[in-house]
């Protein structure tokens, strides 16, 4: 359903995966895990295809710019390098991706949500605080707030935090504290902690952690949230 594309916007070269619905719809930026967009352990392209089936124009930017990992050690190095050394480029890729989606002829209305998983969940929180005027809703999945500053006081868009009870990477209490700060802004905030599951429970390519029942429920809630705020 989708395809890889490359474009240049505002002097920034971007590559990524786009999936479009038959009749058009609002946009969703889908942010990859620490594996990278092209990793065999990533299901981000499949998630974009599923969003398209639900009536969204989904675009997954490649924030690693062609690099990817197939083991935790290399994935950790890529993620750490991105957050420590490349955030200016990450910001530029994100802004270019938002412009790309809003200019896409399939995107109608011209609203854009953002979701992501693992380090992509972190970026979904980060972008909601850094660029609240560029997006209309955010759904971070098990993001790691400890690896970059999340400007919770500046989050002004509806946001839905999805967490795993037994997540060994994420301090759920820290994410809930962020949610409380956002709530004080008068923003619609939701938090869902899925019991009995761990990090990456939505990734069907990770048989060691995938939970089909809770993954489907989280997916349904995500689609409903975006339909509420993007359509």
UniProtKB/Swiss-Prot annotation:
Protein name: Protein usf
Pfam families: DLH
Database matches in InterPro entries: AB_hydrolase_fold, Dienelactn_hydro, Dienelactone_hydrolase-like
Superkingdom classification of source: Bacteria
GO molecular function, one term: hydrolase activity
Organism this protein belongs to: Aquifex pyrophilus
Disulfide links within the chain: none
Name of the gene this protein is made from: usf
